[in-house]
Amino acid sequence: MMDGVMSHGLELEIVSSSFARNEHRAQTVSGNAEQTLDRTDHGDRNRISLLSPLIWEGDSAFDAWLTASSVQVAPVLLTLPSSFAQLGLASGIGLQVLYGFMGCWTCYVITALYADYRRIKESHNTSYQNHTIQWHEVLQGLLGPRWMALGLFFNTTYMICLAAIQMIASGSIAFYINDHYSKRTWTMIFGAIFLLTTLIPTAHNYRLWSFLGILMTTYTSWYLTIAAVTHGQALNVKHTGPKKLDEYFMGAANILYTFGGHGFTVEIMHAMWKPKKYKLVYVYAVLYIFSLTIPSASSMYWAFGDGLLNNFNAFSFLPKTKFRSAAAVAMLMHEFIQFSFCSLPIHLVWEKLLGLHHSRHFYIRAIARIPIVLFLWLISLMFPFFGTINSVVGSLLVSAAVYIIPCLAHMTYYWSFMTRENAIEQPILCRGSWRAMFLVDAFVVLWVTILGVGLGGWASMKNLIQQAHKFGLFSTCFNCPKKP
Protein backbone atom coordinates (compact mmCIF):
# COMPACT_ATOMS: atom_id res chain seq x y z
CA MET A 1 0.00 0.00 0.00
CA MET A 2 2.85 2.38 0.85
CA ASP A 3 4.51 1.92 -2.55
CA GLY A 4 1.23 2.70 -4.26
CA VAL A 5 0.74 5.84 -2.27
CA MET A 6 4.28 7.04 -2.99
CA SER A 7 4.03 6.51 -6.72
CA HIS A 8 0.64 8.14 -6.78
CA GLY A 9 2.05 11.16 -4.88
CA LEU A 10 4.73 11.59 -7.58
CA GLU A 11 2.10 11.57 -10.32
CA LEU A 12 0.18 14.32 -8.58
CA GLU A 13 3.21 16.49 -7.84
CA ILE A 14 2.78 18.70 -10.90
CA VAL A 15 -1.00 18.95 -10.47
CA SER A 16 -0.76 20.03 -6.85
CA SER A 17 2.39 22.19 -7.07
CA SER A 18 0.41 25.43 -6.91
CA PHE A 19 -1.48 24.12 -3.88
CA ALA A 20 1.82 23.17 -2.18
CA ARG A 21 3.41 26.60 -2.85
CA ASN A 22 0.39 28.42 -1.44
CA GLU A 23 0.32 26.03 1.47
CA HIS A 24 4.02 26.66 2.15
CA ARG A 25 3.49 30.41 2.25
CA ALA A 26 0.40 30.11 4.44
CA GLN A 27 2.15 27.78 6.88
CA THR A 28 5.19 30.05 7.09
CA VAL A 29 3.04 33.06 7.90
CA SER A 30 0.93 31.10 10.38
CA GLY A 31 3.93 29.50 12.06
CA ASN A 32 5.81 32.77 12.48
CA ALA A 33 2.67 34.46 13.77
CA GLU A 34 2.21 31.99 16.60
CA GLN A 35 5.78 31.38 17.76
CA THR A 36 6.00 34.37 20.12
CA LEU A 37 3.85 35.19 23.09
CA ASP A 38 3.45 38.82 22.04
CA ARG A 39 4.08 40.05 18.50
CA THR A 40 4.69 43.57 19.81
CA ASP A 41 7.54 42.41 22.03
CA HIS A 42 10.36 43.05 19.54
CA GLY A 43 13.07 42.99 22.20
CA ASP A 44 12.66 39.29 22.99
CA ARG A 45 12.06 38.11 19.43
CA ASN A 46 15.72 37.89 18.47
CA ARG A 47 16.61 35.77 21.49
CA ILE A 48 13.68 33.43 20.85
CA SER A 49 14.55 33.09 17.16
CA LEU A 50 18.01 31.71 18.01
CA LEU A 51 16.51 28.69 19.77
CA SER A 52 13.25 28.25 17.90
CA PRO A 53 14.66 26.38 14.86
CA LEU A 54 16.17 23.81 17.22
CA ILE A 55 13.47 23.23 19.85
CA TRP A 56 10.38 25.19 18.84
CA GLU A 57 9.61 25.02 15.13
CA GLY A 58 8.26 21.61 14.13
CA ASP A 59 6.99 21.71 10.56
CA SER A 60 8.81 18.87 8.80
CA ALA A 61 7.65 15.34 8.03
CA PHE A 62 10.06 14.05 10.68
CA ASP A 63 8.52 16.36 13.27
CA ALA A 64 5.10 15.03 12.32
CA TRP A 65 6.39 11.46 12.76
CA LEU A 66 7.78 12.34 16.18
CA THR A 67 4.45 13.81 17.22
CA ALA A 68 2.32 11.00 15.79
CA SER A 69 4.51 8.32 17.39
CA SER A 70 4.80 10.15 20.69
CA VAL A 71 1.10 10.75 21.29
CA GLN A 72 -0.12 7.39 20.01
CA VAL A 73 0.35 5.18 23.05
CA ALA A 74 1.38 6.78 26.38
CA PRO A 75 -0.48 5.14 29.34
CA VAL A 76 -1.87 2.45 27.04
CA LEU A 77 1.54 0.77 27.34
CA LEU A 78 0.58 0.02 30.94
CA THR A 79 -2.94 -1.27 30.18
CA LEU A 80 -2.28 -3.36 27.06
CA PRO A 81 -0.92 -6.34 29.05
CA SER A 82 -4.29 -6.58 30.81
CA SER A 83 -6.01 -6.40 27.42
CA PHE A 84 -3.90 -9.36 26.29
CA ALA A 85 -5.08 -11.28 29.37
CA GLN A 86 -8.68 -10.48 28.39
CA LEU A 87 -8.20 -11.36 24.72
CA GLY A 88 -5.53 -14.03 24.64
CA LEU A 89 -2.19 -13.62 22.86
CA ALA A 90 -3.37 -14.36 19.31
CA SER A 91 -6.37 -12.02 19.44
CA GLY A 92 -4.32 -9.33 21.17
CA ILE A 93 -1.67 -9.23 18.45
CA GLY A 94 -4.19 -9.72 15.63
CA LEU A 95 -6.43 -6.86 16.75
CA GLN A 96 -3.44 -4.55 17.20
CA VAL A 97 -2.40 -5.15 13.60
CA LEU A 98 -5.97 -4.80 12.30
CA TYR A 99 -6.76 -1.60 14.19
CA GLY A 100 -3.35 -0.16 13.41
CA PHE A 101 -3.89 -0.42 9.68
CA MET A 102 -7.53 0.65 9.96
CA GLY A 103 -6.13 3.74 11.64
CA CYS A 104 -3.77 4.23 8.70
CA TRP A 105 -6.74 4.06 6.34
CA THR A 106 -8.83 6.64 8.18
CA CYS A 107 -5.77 8.88 8.47
CA TYR A 108 -5.43 8.68 4.67
CA VAL A 109 -9.12 9.56 4.32
CA ILE A 110 -8.72 12.62 6.55
CA THR A 111 -5.64 13.67 4.59
CA ALA A 112 -7.59 13.51 1.31
CA LEU A 113 -10.47 15.59 2.67
CA TYR A 114 -8.09 18.15 4.18
CA ALA A 115 -6.22 18.56 0.88
CA ASP A 116 -9.42 19.32 -1.03
CA TYR A 117 -10.59 21.69 1.69
CA ARG A 118 -7.34 23.66 1.54
CA ARG A 119 -7.46 23.83 -2.25
CA ILE A 120 -11.03 25.18 -2.22
CA LYS A 121 -10.28 27.75 0.46
CA GLU A 122 -7.07 28.94 -1.15
CA SER A 123 -8.85 29.36 -4.47
CA HIS A 124 -10.89 32.03 -2.64
CA ASN A 125 -7.70 33.64 -1.26
CA THR A 126 -8.51 32.62 2.31
CA SER A 127 -5.79 33.63 4.77
CA TYR A 128 -4.71 31.35 7.62
CA GLN A 129 -2.64 33.90 9.49
CA ASN A 130 -3.04 33.19 13.22
CA HIS A 131 -5.57 30.46 12.43
CA THR A 132 -5.29 26.70 12.94
CA ILE A 133 -7.58 24.54 10.79
CA GLN A 134 -9.46 21.81 12.66
CA TRP A 135 -11.38 18.71 11.62
CA HIS A 136 -14.85 20.16 12.18
CA GLU A 137 -13.96 23.11 9.92
CA VAL A 138 -12.97 20.70 7.14
CA LEU A 139 -16.33 18.94 7.51
CA GLN A 140 -18.18 22.25 7.44
CA GLY A 141 -16.34 23.47 4.35
CA LEU A 142 -16.95 20.26 2.40
CA LEU A 143 -20.26 18.89 3.71
CA GLY A 144 -22.06 21.64 5.59
CA PRO A 145 -23.01 22.66 9.16
CA ARG A 146 -24.64 19.37 10.22
CA TRP A 147 -21.46 17.45 9.54
CA MET A 148 -19.53 20.19 11.31
CA ALA A 149 -21.69 19.82 14.43
CA LEU A 150 -21.29 16.04 14.35
CA GLY A 151 -17.51 16.21 14.05
CA LEU A 152 -17.21 18.97 16.64
CA PHE A 153 -19.24 17.08 19.24
CA PHE A 154 -17.51 13.72 18.94
CA ASN A 155 -13.97 15.00 18.42
CA THR A 156 -14.12 17.53 21.24
CA THR A 157 -15.72 15.06 23.65
CA TYR A 158 -13.09 12.49 22.73
CA MET A 159 -10.27 14.97 23.33
CA ILE A 160 -11.76 15.99 26.69
CA CYS A 161 -11.84 12.37 27.84
CA LEU A 162 -8.40 11.63 26.37
CA ALA A 163 -6.86 14.60 28.19
CA ALA A 164 -8.56 13.59 31.45
CA ILE A 165 -7.15 10.07 31.07
CA GLN A 166 -3.63 11.54 31.05
CA MET A 167 -4.28 13.16 34.43
CA ILE A 168 -5.76 9.93 35.80
CA ALA A 169 -2.76 7.99 34.52
CA SER A 170 -0.35 10.47 36.11
CA GLY A 171 -1.88 9.93 39.54
CA SER A 172 -1.82 6.16 39.10
CA ILE A 173 1.80 6.10 37.88
CA ALA A 174 3.09 8.49 40.57
CA PHE A 175 1.58 6.22 43.23
CA TYR A 176 4.07 3.51 42.24
CA ILE A 177 6.95 5.92 42.86
CA ASN A 178 5.70 7.18 46.23
CA ASP A 179 2.71 5.46 47.82
CA HIS A 180 2.66 7.76 50.85
CA TYR A 181 0.12 9.83 48.93
CA SER A 182 -3.09 8.47 47.45
CA LYS A 183 -3.72 8.40 43.72
CA ARG A 184 -6.27 11.20 44.12
CA THR A 185 -3.69 13.39 45.86
CA TRP A 186 -1.19 12.76 43.09
CA THR A 187 -3.84 13.58 40.49
CA MET A 188 -4.49 16.90 42.23
CA ILE A 189 -0.77 17.68 42.22
CA PHE A 190 -0.33 16.89 38.54
CA GLY A 191 -3.47 18.79 37.64
CA ALA A 192 -1.77 21.92 38.94
CA ILE A 193 1.42 21.11 37.01
CA PHE A 194 -0.56 20.54 33.81
CA LEU A 195 -1.72 24.17 33.89
CA LEU A 196 1.66 24.96 32.32
CA THR A 197 0.55 23.27 29.09
CA THR A 198 -1.57 26.33 28.29
CA LEU A 199 1.67 28.08 27.30
CA ILE A 200 2.24 25.98 24.14
CA PRO A 201 0.59 27.88 21.25
CA THR A 202 -0.02 25.35 18.46
CA ALA A 203 0.96 21.95 17.06
CA HIS A 204 3.77 23.81 15.29
CA ASN A 205 5.63 24.15 18.61
CA TYR A 206 6.20 20.56 19.74
CA ARG A 207 9.58 19.58 18.29
CA LEU A 208 11.41 19.22 21.62
CA TRP A 209 8.40 17.80 23.46
CA SER A 210 7.69 15.18 20.80
CA PHE A 211 11.32 14.10 20.76
CA LEU A 212 11.32 13.70 24.55
CA GLY A 213 7.97 11.93 24.42
CA ILE A 214 9.13 9.23 22.05
CA LEU A 215 12.25 8.65 24.18
CA MET A 216 10.05 8.20 27.25
CA THR A 217 7.67 5.69 25.67
CA THR A 218 10.51 3.75 24.07
CA TYR A 219 12.33 3.39 27.39
CA THR A 220 9.16 2.36 29.23
CA SER A 221 8.20 -0.19 26.60
CA TRP A 222 11.56 -1.91 26.64
CA TYR A 223 11.75 -1.73 30.43
CA LEU A 224 8.47 -3.67 30.61
CA THR A 225 9.73 -6.20 28.07
CA ILE A 226 13.10 -6.81 29.73
CA ALA A 227 11.73 -6.70 33.30
CA ALA A 228 9.04 -9.27 32.48
CA VAL A 229 11.49 -11.64 30.79
CA THR A 230 14.08 -11.39 33.58
CA HIS A 231 11.38 -11.79 36.23
CA GLY A 232 10.24 -15.02 34.64
CA GLN A 233 6.84 -16.60 34.89
CA ALA A 234 4.94 -16.14 38.12
CA LEU A 235 4.21 -19.15 40.31
CA ASN A 236 1.34 -21.24 38.94
CA VAL A 237 0.82 -18.76 36.11
CA LYS A 238 -2.10 -19.51 33.79
CA HIS A 239 -2.87 -18.26 30.29
CA THR A 240 -6.55 -19.04 30.03
CA GLY A 241 -7.35 -16.45 27.40
CA PRO A 242 -10.85 -15.04 26.98
CA LYS A 243 -13.26 -16.26 29.65
CA LYS A 244 -16.19 -13.87 29.34
CA LEU A 245 -17.61 -11.98 26.38
CA ASP A 246 -17.66 -8.68 28.24
CA GLU A 247 -13.96 -9.02 29.14
CA TYR A 248 -13.07 -9.91 25.56
CA PHE A 249 -14.82 -6.93 23.99
CA MET A 250 -13.57 -4.60 26.71
CA GLY A 251 -10.01 -5.63 25.84
CA ALA A 252 -10.74 -5.12 22.14
CA ALA A 253 -12.09 -1.63 22.89
CA ASN A 254 -8.87 -0.74 24.70
CA ILE A 255 -6.85 -1.72 21.62
CA LEU A 256 -9.21 0.36 19.47
CA TYR A 257 -8.44 3.25 21.84
CA THR A 258 -4.71 2.58 21.42
CA PHE A 259 -4.83 3.39 17.70
CA GLY A 260 -7.17 6.37 17.96
CA GLY A 261 -4.37 8.90 18.25
CA HIS A 262 -5.13 10.36 14.83
CA GLY A 263 -7.98 12.38 16.35
CA PHE A 264 -5.79 15.47 15.94
CA THR A 265 -4.55 14.65 12.45
CA VAL A 266 -5.69 17.97 10.99
CA GLU A 267 -3.88 20.02 13.64
CA ILE A 268 -0.64 18.13 12.93
CA MET A 269 -1.08 18.46 9.16
CA HIS A 270 -1.75 22.18 9.45
CA ALA A 271 1.63 22.57 11.18
CA MET A 272 3.46 20.85 8.28
CA TRP A 273 4.91 22.51 5.21
CA LYS A 274 3.84 19.55 3.10
CA PRO A 275 0.79 18.01 4.81
CA LYS A 276 0.10 15.58 1.96
CA LYS A 277 3.07 13.54 3.27
CA TYR A 278 1.27 12.84 6.53
CA LYS A 279 -0.53 9.77 5.19
CA LEU A 280 2.85 8.04 4.89
CA VAL A 281 4.18 9.56 8.09
CA TYR A 282 1.35 7.97 10.03
CA VAL A 283 2.03 4.53 8.53
CA TYR A 284 5.64 4.73 9.73
CA ALA A 285 4.42 5.90 13.14
CA VAL A 286 2.10 2.89 13.47
CA LEU A 287 4.88 0.49 12.49
CA TYR A 288 7.08 1.99 15.19
CA ILE A 289 4.25 1.72 17.72
CA PHE A 290 3.96 -2.00 16.92
CA SER A 291 7.62 -2.37 17.94
CA LEU A 292 6.73 -0.91 21.35
CA THR A 293 3.34 -2.39 22.16
CA ILE A 294 3.56 -5.98 20.91
CA PRO A 295 6.83 -7.01 22.66
CA SER A 296 5.95 -5.34 25.98
CA ALA A 297 2.36 -6.61 26.18
CA SER A 298 3.33 -10.12 25.02
CA SER A 299 6.18 -10.49 27.50
CA MET A 300 4.09 -9.19 30.40
CA TYR A 301 1.30 -11.62 29.51
CA TRP A 302 3.81 -14.47 29.28
CA ALA A 303 5.18 -13.65 32.73
CA PHE A 304 1.97 -12.91 34.66
CA GLY A 305 -0.84 -14.45 32.61
CA ASP A 306 -4.35 -14.23 34.07
CA GLY A 307 -3.04 -12.27 37.05
CA LEU A 308 -3.07 -9.17 34.82
CA LEU A 309 -6.87 -9.18 35.06
CA ASN A 310 -6.62 -7.98 38.68
CA ASN A 311 -4.95 -4.64 37.94
CA PHE A 312 -4.74 -2.53 34.78
CA ASN A 313 -1.38 -0.93 35.63
CA ALA A 314 1.56 -3.08 34.54
CA PHE A 315 3.87 -1.39 37.06
CA SER A 316 1.95 -3.04 39.90
CA PHE A 317 3.26 -6.49 38.88
CA LEU A 318 6.95 -5.61 38.76
CA PRO A 319 9.27 -5.24 41.77
CA LYS A 320 10.12 -1.74 42.91
CA THR A 321 13.57 -0.99 41.51
CA LYS A 322 15.41 2.06 40.24
CA PHE A 323 14.56 0.96 36.70
CA ARG A 324 10.84 0.82 37.46
CA SER A 325 11.04 4.22 39.12
CA ALA A 326 12.87 5.59 36.08
CA ALA A 327 10.17 4.16 33.80
CA ALA A 328 7.47 5.71 35.99
CA VAL A 329 9.20 9.11 35.87
CA ALA A 330 9.55 8.76 32.10
CA MET A 331 5.84 8.05 31.78
CA LEU A 332 4.99 11.04 33.97
CA MET A 333 7.03 13.29 31.70
CA HIS A 334 5.25 11.78 28.74
CA GLU A 335 1.83 12.31 30.34
CA PHE A 336 2.60 16.03 30.54
CA ILE A 337 3.40 16.09 26.82
CA GLN A 338 0.42 13.90 25.93
CA PHE A 339 -1.96 16.03 27.98
CA SER A 340 -0.67 19.14 26.27
CA PHE A 341 -1.35 17.75 22.82
CA CYS A 342 -4.72 16.22 23.73
CA SER A 343 -5.95 19.47 25.24
CA LEU A 344 -4.68 21.61 22.35
CA PRO A 345 -7.70 20.98 20.03
CA ILE A 346 -10.02 21.82 22.95
CA HIS A 347 -8.13 25.05 23.61
CA LEU A 348 -8.39 26.04 19.95
CA VAL A 349 -12.15 25.40 19.86
CA TRP A 350 -12.55 27.38 23.07
CA GLU A 351 -10.51 30.30 21.72
CA LYS A 352 -12.63 30.41 18.56
CA LEU A 353 -15.81 30.32 20.64
CA LEU A 354 -14.61 33.28 22.72
CA GLY A 355 -13.36 35.16 19.64
CA LEU A 356 -9.75 35.13 20.91
CA HIS A 357 -8.16 32.72 18.44
CA HIS A 358 -6.81 35.47 16.20
CA SER A 359 -5.51 37.60 19.07
CA ARG A 360 -1.98 38.92 18.48
CA HIS A 361 -1.29 38.65 22.22
CA PHE A 362 -0.81 35.03 23.16
CA TYR A 363 -0.90 35.67 26.90
CA ILE A 364 -4.61 36.49 26.53
CA ARG A 365 -5.22 33.15 24.85
CA ALA A 366 -3.14 31.33 27.49
CA ILE A 367 -5.19 32.84 30.32
CA ALA A 368 -8.42 31.95 28.51
CA ARG A 369 -7.30 28.29 28.37
CA ILE A 370 -7.04 27.89 32.16
CA PRO A 371 -10.76 27.05 32.73
CA ILE A 372 -10.41 24.15 30.27
CA VAL A 373 -7.61 22.59 32.32
CA LEU A 374 -9.60 23.08 35.53
CA PHE A 375 -12.58 21.32 33.93
CA LEU A 376 -10.38 18.41 32.85
CA TRP A 377 -8.94 18.30 36.36
CA LEU A 378 -12.45 17.88 37.80
CA ILE A 379 -13.31 15.05 35.39
CA SER A 380 -10.11 13.16 36.22
CA LEU A 381 -10.87 13.37 39.95
CA MET A 382 -14.48 12.28 39.44
CA PHE A 383 -13.70 9.21 37.29
CA PRO A 384 -10.31 7.85 38.48
CA PHE A 385 -10.87 4.41 36.93
CA PHE A 386 -7.55 3.94 35.14
CA GLY A 387 -7.83 1.29 32.43
CA THR A 388 -11.61 0.95 32.62
CA ILE A 389 -12.27 4.43 31.29
CA ASN A 390 -9.83 3.83 28.41
CA SER A 391 -12.09 1.11 27.04
CA VAL A 392 -15.20 3.28 27.40
CA VAL A 393 -13.57 6.11 25.47
CA GLY A 394 -12.28 3.69 22.86
CA SER A 395 -15.63 2.05 22.21
CA LEU A 396 -17.93 5.07 22.29
CA LEU A 397 -15.81 8.05 21.23
CA VAL A 398 -12.77 6.83 19.32
CA SER A 399 -15.06 4.64 17.22
CA ALA A 400 -17.15 7.58 16.07
CA ALA A 401 -14.61 10.39 16.05
CA VAL A 402 -11.69 8.81 14.20
CA TYR A 403 -13.14 5.81 12.36
CA ILE A 404 -16.85 6.08 11.53
CA ILE A 405 -17.25 9.82 10.82
CA PRO A 406 -14.14 10.18 8.58
CA CYS A 407 -15.09 7.14 6.47
CA LEU A 408 -18.72 8.25 6.13
CA ALA A 409 -17.58 11.77 5.23
CA HIS A 410 -15.20 10.36 2.62
CA MET A 411 -17.97 8.32 0.97
CA THR A 412 -20.47 11.18 1.10
CA TYR A 413 -18.18 13.87 -0.30
CA TYR A 414 -16.68 11.79 -3.10
CA TRP A 415 -19.96 10.18 -4.11
CA SER A 416 -20.37 12.99 -6.64
CA PHE A 417 -18.64 12.45 -9.99
CA MET A 418 -17.44 16.07 -10.05
CA THR A 419 -15.70 15.90 -6.68
CA ARG A 420 -14.06 12.61 -7.66
CA GLU A 421 -12.72 14.15 -10.87
CA ASN A 422 -11.32 17.18 -9.02
CA ALA A 423 -9.93 15.27 -6.02
CA ILE A 424 -6.26 15.90 -5.26
CA GLU A 425 -5.90 12.41 -3.77
CA GLN A 426 -7.04 9.94 -6.41
CA PRO A 427 -7.79 6.29 -5.46
CA ILE A 428 -4.83 4.19 -4.39
CA LEU A 429 -6.57 0.78 -4.57
CA CYS A 430 -7.31 -1.51 -7.52
CA ARG A 431 -5.81 0.77 -10.18
CA GLY A 432 -7.71 3.84 -9.16
CA SER A 433 -11.07 2.28 -8.32
CA TRP A 434 -13.37 4.51 -6.27
CA ARG A 435 -15.61 1.51 -5.71
CA ALA A 436 -12.78 -0.28 -3.90
CA MET A 437 -12.20 2.81 -1.77
CA PHE A 438 -15.86 2.95 -0.77
CA LEU A 439 -15.86 -0.76 0.05
CA VAL A 440 -12.98 -0.27 2.48
CA ASP A 441 -14.79 2.72 4.01
CA ALA A 442 -17.93 0.62 4.44
CA PHE A 443 -15.97 -2.26 6.01
CA VAL A 444 -14.37 0.07 8.58
CA VAL A 445 -17.73 1.66 9.44
CA LEU A 446 -19.52 -1.69 9.87
CA TRP A 447 -16.70 -3.36 11.80
CA VAL A 448 -16.21 -0.49 14.24
CA THR A 449 -19.95 0.09 14.67
CA ILE A 450 -20.69 -3.55 15.53
CA LEU A 451 -17.57 -4.60 17.46
CA GLY A 452 -16.54 -1.20 18.78
CA VAL A 453 -19.66 0.81 19.57
CA GLY A 454 -22.04 -2.12 19.99
CA LEU A 455 -20.26 -4.97 21.75
CA GLY A 456 -17.33 -2.91 23.02
CA GLY A 457 -19.61 -0.18 24.34
CA TRP A 458 -21.77 -2.72 26.16
CA ALA A 459 -18.81 -4.43 27.82
CA SER A 460 -17.00 -1.21 28.75
CA MET A 461 -20.05 0.54 30.20
CA LYS A 462 -20.94 -2.58 32.20
CA ASN A 463 -17.47 -2.61 33.73
CA LEU A 464 -17.46 1.15 34.36
CA ILE A 465 -20.79 0.97 36.22
CA GLN A 466 -19.46 -1.91 38.34
CA GLN A 467 -16.33 0.06 39.22
CA ALA A 468 -18.35 3.17 40.06
CA HIS A 469 -20.59 1.16 42.42
CA LYS A 470 -17.60 -0.56 44.01
CA PHE A 471 -15.28 2.43 44.50
CA GLY A 472 -17.61 5.42 44.03
CA LEU A 473 -17.00 8.69 42.22
CA PHE A 474 -14.02 10.76 43.42
CA SER A 475 -12.45 7.55 44.75
CA THR A 476 -9.44 8.21 46.96
CA CYS A 477 -7.27 5.38 45.68
CA PHE A 478 -8.72 3.24 42.88
CA ASN A 479 -7.32 -0.33 42.86
CA CYS A 480 -4.68 0.48 45.47
CA PRO A 481 -3.23 -2.50 47.35
CA LYS A 482 -4.28 -2.75 50.97
CA LYS A 483 -1.58 -1.66 53.38
CA PRO A 484 -0.58 -4.25 56.00
Where are these regions (language model features)?
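Extracellular loop-to-transmembrane helix junctions
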Residues: 81-125, 129
